[in-house]
Every structure is written in C-alpha cells, then in structure tokens.
Amino acid sequence: MAPQDRLTSTLTRPASTTTAPLLQVSGLSVAYGGRQVVSGVDLALGAGGSLALIGESGSGKSTIARALLRLLPASGRATGHVELAGREVLGLPERRFRPLRGRTLGFVPQDPASALNPVRTIGVQALEAAELVDGLAKEDRREAVLETFAQVGLTDPQRVFAAHPHELSGGMLQRVLIGLAVLPRPSLLVADEPTSALDVTIQKRILDLLSTLRADLGISLLLITHDLAIAAERAESLIVLKDGRIQEAGTTAEVFANPTSAYARQLHADVPALNPDRYADLRAVGEGRAGDPARIEVQGVTKTFGSLTAVDDVSFAVPAGTTHALVGESGSGKTTAIRLLLGLEQPDSGRIVVAGEELHGRSHASLRSVRRHLQLVYQNPFTSLDPTWKVERLVREPLDRYRIGDPASRRELVRETLRSVGLGEELVSRKPSALSGGQRQRVAIARALVLRPDVIVLDEPTSALDVSVQADIVETLLRLQADLGLTYVFVSHDLSLVRQLAHTVSVMRTGRVVEHGTVASIFDSPQEEYTRTLLASLPVGAA
Amino acid sequence: MSGYGGFALRRAGQAVVVVLLTYVFTFWVISVLPGDPVTTTLRNPQNGFTEEEIARIVSYYGLDRPVLVQLWESLSRFVTGDLGVSLRSNRSVADMIGEVLPSTLVLAAASLTIAVVLSFAIAFGVHYLPRPFSTALRSVPSLFLSVPGFLVGLLLIQVFSFGLGLFRAIDTDGPVATFFAALTLGIWVSAQIAEVLIANLDHEAAQEYAGVARSRGLGRLRMLLKHLLKPSSLPVVTVLALMIGEVLGGAVITEAVFGRTGIGNLVERSVASQDLPVLQAVVTLAAVVFVVVNLLADLVYPLLDPRVTLQARPEVGANA
C-alpha cells in the first residue's frame, strides 16, 4: 500500500492527492564549495504521507532538508529538481519562493533552545506565523496563536506568549516551534531531528504530538533522524542515506522485513532498541560474577547545592566485573552522583567505598592513590581530549603522573593499550583533530585503561557518536570487561543501550533512586510508575 | 525588581569611588611632577614679586602646607562642587569650564549622533543591498579608520567652506560649521561602531533562529529590522560608551582644526601654561563623563537583554 493510498482511509481531510505527489525530488545534489555532500537524491512524498530520511552524521540528511527549505548557507549550491505541489521551486527566485515559506512548507528545527530569537518574546515571534494565515484579521491573530499553543499541549498559553525563550524548557520550546510551524496549515512539515536534544519522555510526547497533528491536519511529514527506531515507528516510508547517496528506499515494513543494502542491514543490527540481546554472550561473563563481593558501595549519599538536593539518599552496590547503569533524564542527579563517586565532590552525608577503601575524608595524596583505580571516560570525545597533544602523549599522561615504569616500558604499555581498544600503531603520532569521533573515544578509553584500573566510570560514552560507531565502542567495552574483569558504572539516558550492556540498573529521578534491580527485572517487570513511563517512551521500532 | 535596584545602587557606588580615586590620582601625579608652576611664575623676575609677597600668596593658596592636607582640602572642596581657581586668570575653574563646555557638548553629541546614523546606515547597506554594493560597503569602515581625523577636517573645510562657501571657516560656532566639525569626528567614530555592528549582524544571521524565522516567510527587511537588529545592537551600547572617551579625546584635534573654543582648546592652553587646577578639573570631568556613561550602559543593558541576569542563581544541574 503506497503512503498516499493509506492516507485516504485515515485522514479527516479529503484527499486531493492520488495524482502527483506533494513533494517530488529528483537528482538533487548539493555541494559546499567544491565538496559534494549530496549526490543525485530522488524522493517522493504524497500529501498527508510521512517519509523519514535516516542517516548518520555526514550522510547529508540535514543538508537535503536545508536545500528543500532553501536555507543552505551561502556557500551551498543545490542542483536538480524539487517540485512542491506541482511547481518547480529549486530555481525559483527568493521573492517568488517566499510566499511558500510557512504557508506550504513548515520547518521544525533540531535544537529548540536556539531556534527562537532570544531577545524577543515568544508571542511576537508567534504572531509572525499567524500573519501567514490568509484571511485572519489582525486582531484575531493573538487568539489564533493562543489556540495553537493549547493545541500543541502547552498548559498556560498566556504565560508562554509573554515569555522569552530562555524562560521555557526545551520540551516547551519544541512545542512552541511545532505550533508556529503548523499554525499556517502548511501542506508539508520538514522536521530535522526534532527530538534529539530532548529527554526521552519528552521525546515521546513531541513525536506523539507530530503524529497527532499530522493526522488531524493532514500535513505531510518529512522526518530527518539518525534514529532508526524512531523512523520506523513514525514514518510510512524510509530512505536510508550514506555519504550523500541513497542506500535504500521503500516502505518502512519492507525495509525492516527485508533490507537489501548492506548498510541498511548493518544499521539495523547496530540500533540498540532493535537488538536488546546483541551482546548477550559477552554480558554473560559478567552475569556469572553477580554474587561476587561489591567493588563499589554507595551508602545513603546525599549532596545539596544551596536549596537544591542534587543527590538524595542514594545507595547502590556494584559487584566486581559487572556493569551498573545509572539511568535518568536531565536534572535526575546522575551527573552529581558520578562526581561524588570520583571524589570530585564531597557528600553531605553517607559513605562511598571503592575497592574496600573509603573515598571521603581523605587527604589529597591518598585520594590520588584511590583515583588510580578509578577512571573516567567522558561524554564528548570532541572536547575531552587536549587538541594540541598527540595520541601517544594523551594515553601516556596517566603513566607519567603516577610514575609507572621507565619511558621505554611506558611507550610499550601505551601501544599495547591502544591495540586492546582496536587502535593501530599508525595513530600514535596523530592529534585528536585527525581522528574520527569513534577513534577519539577509543583514545579516551585507552587513556582510562592504561593504569589498569578496577573501576571505569562511563559518562554517556557514546551519546556524541553515530549508532554504528556506538556499537563498535560498546563491543570493545564489553570485551575488555570480559577479559580484564573491569567494573563499570555506566551513566546514560538511553535505556535501550543500558539493556544491551548493563547487569544492574538504578533509575534516578530528581536526585533519588526510584527503582533498582537487575536489567531483566527493571525492563520486564518495572514496579514504579516512572520506570514504566521511561520504558514506554522508548521507540519500539518495527511498525 | 529589587534585584535591579540593588544592582543599580551597587554600580552607582562603584562609579563614585572611581571618580574620587581619579581625583586623588590626578592630584598625586601633579604633586610629584617636577617643577612647581606657582613658584616658577611668582619667581619670574618679570613679575617683580618680593619674597614677602610670594610667601603671602603661597600661604594664601595653602601651598606651604603638607601635600596630604592640601589633598584633603582640595578633595573636600571638590565634593562640595568647588573646583578651585585658575592660576593664570585668577578666575573660578568652574566658570572657565562652564564657558567652553556647551560648545564641546554640542560637538560631542552631534558627532555621536552622526556616528550612530552613519554606522547603522553602513551596516544596513552591507546586509540589505545586493552584492557588488554590499561588498564595497564592507570595506568602508576600514577606510574611515585609516584616514586621520585632521585630514578629513581639512578636506571638509577646503571643499565645503573655501570651495562651495557653505560656511565661513572663521565663523566657528555656526550650525553648518558645527555640523562639519561633528562630521569629521563622527566619521571616525562611526567606523568602529559599524565594524562591531556588521560583525554582529553576520553572526546573528548565521544563527539557527534566523533560519527558522526565514522559514516562516519573513522577508529580508523584516528579518533585519525585527530579528537581527536588536541582538546585534546590544554590544553596540558598550562600544558607544567606550566611544565617548574617544570623542572627548578627538575633540582636541577637531577643535583645533576648526578653530573652535571648547574643552580641547582649554586643555591645550592649560597644558601650555601649567594651569594645574584647570587640568585637574578637566581630567576629573572626563572621568565623571566616562564613568557616568558606562554606568548608564550597564544600567540599560539588563533592560534591553532579557537573558542578562543580575543575581547569581543557585547552581542547578540543567533542569529542563
């Protein structure tokens, strides 16, 4: 069943659309300067239909969106054909394209926090969208805006209207932006990663809102995403992109049941949500250690900042050689919890014991000796490595700090550690800028590993990476754990990833552990409402 | 709004301290400078004072007392608004400054107005005009900056006074002459404002929100006026406050070129004759102007930009 046929049965708006598709793109290529980033892309989207463009960073998916919206930076050149509602628009002068903006073609951007003018009120900017509604009298515009705000689920439209962007949360801002985009009733909505900057529960609500609006208003949706599971759940057809070229296209069901391209198959295998048991073998090694004595014990730890209790009576224990996951949304206290665990903050009360040694109330020097056994891999490999240092020096630094071995043995240890994380000899003299994101994170892991620590704290170690790179890193981490018996504390907002690699889980919310247990018990029979909400927010993938 | 009141009070207090410190510092610099203008003048044989008369005059002015006592008296007079008496003309310094101040204020105000209008016009042109014009306009600020002010002034006099006869070069305070003097100063100041403004507009135009606003169908003019102008102009407030100092400094040259009697002219004469009370007063006046203008800029900023918060809020881990 083609998307446009399915549409006639489900939509309230009469379908005027069985003929030409609303959006027909053929041979679209985009180049920045001399660099070709999109090559010969064809796609079609019927009125009321939904199409997802999927790809990793550098796949050209956002560039395609910007080319369609004609928002490419000055250096970008688009060639080919883009027909919108039967009209060629790519070659149209801006003056003639402008009437289509907003009215025919709406845009929901990626990062809601930067998508509204920070020094103007939301209301003033919303009125700009209301102006595009034909036949709406000036004095009725405000009313229309407030109605739209209510429609997109903003509880206090008056307050939102008067607010400046920095006074609202990311989820509220994304609702505002969706409201502004749908207010003039466009026929096509281009949503560029509309939820990737948001927490998982909010992500689900925003996607639900887009689905509802699409059905109620008969708007076609072009969804740009890196998340195969979201695309599968929210779009009727998919296009998989890599390096600016289409790898695979078809209805969602087809692509999922029977991916024909190697890349689509690999992508499918790398998405955690679709492969919860991918690393079952490696994980089983740690599973067998579950009864071992605890390597980390956190008992009744509380930390307050002024009036805010960031961590509230948190306790958990991690058996040696296993992975404990701290899961929560922004503001849940997981970051403070690991800062306490690393001895970067002092708790107000409670105790933390790592490898049998009390972490707090220690002198600087003895804290240093504990830290040797306690290493951190930071979230963003693009900022956590000194850009002026070579890989060799980055990995060797901890050895120099703790005066381990002589220069020759340090050099050998650095190379050995790099090999163990899958990095070759040839990279030692490179600087981080000459490495890919995945290679950088491997360097960061090697750097944590080189001291042979017992415990590694992994703070969202793959959230800045593409899904296929993430799969490689996760595999490396689990193999290292199986071989060396490392204990991991894994901090993440990504529940599907947690399910793939952790043994035990603590679910955190506003500083408290709301629920903890083994992965199986948390995922299969959650006891708390909040855990159930989190789990329900996961995109389930296959349609 | 109590946060704003407290902030304003704190900043005003700091401003007062800065002015007082400037006064003390100037006094100190003058007192340690070699050469004592009073005695040099009095002992000049041409003036024919006897030692007795000199001693009487010195004690009349309190110059025989310790420096700290003199500073204290001078400072307490200053606080009550008494700027002392000129050593050359024996007239009240306040009167002398009062005479020339209006002329300089008119010049400064006019040149700042011209600078603001000119710089916004240039920045607008850069962002609104089609390509060859906008590219050409981009280099205008550098051109303005690299031509010395006195040369511009001489050219303007040559063309508009001697050439076209629009004003008489000796009729210095007429409106037309004032306009050209202000233009001389304003061109130079406008270049610095325009550079900041153009860079800010470029930056804002590349922001995500600008693209999103364009996707709502806003035209170039509305984008510029409604979206880009305000965030781009905010830093200009700071630049403008700094420019006040430049304008006061630049007035010395401009006044000389156009033969105006203003503060610049007064400074020139007082330096030549080592008229210390006048210099002390002018330096303090400059400090007051500078401090007040920067205070105003600080006070205006939070009202213009809703994101500027005045109190450190309790640290909250990114609570969405």
Question: What are these regions, as identified by a protein language model?
Answer:
Chain A
Residues 140-159, 409-426, 535-536:
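Conserved ABC ATPase "signature" region
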Residues 89-106, 124, 132, 254-259, ...:
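ABC ATPase NBD coupling module
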Residues 249-250, 516-517:
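ABC ATPase "signature
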Residues 77-88, 350-358, 370:
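Conserved ABC transporter NBD signature motif
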Residues 69, 342:
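Helix-to-loop junction immediately C-terminal to a conserved catalytic motif
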Residues 185, 452:
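Conserved catalytic motifs of ABC-family nucleotide-binding domains
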Residues 164-168, 172, 431-435, 439:
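Conserved ABC ATPase signature
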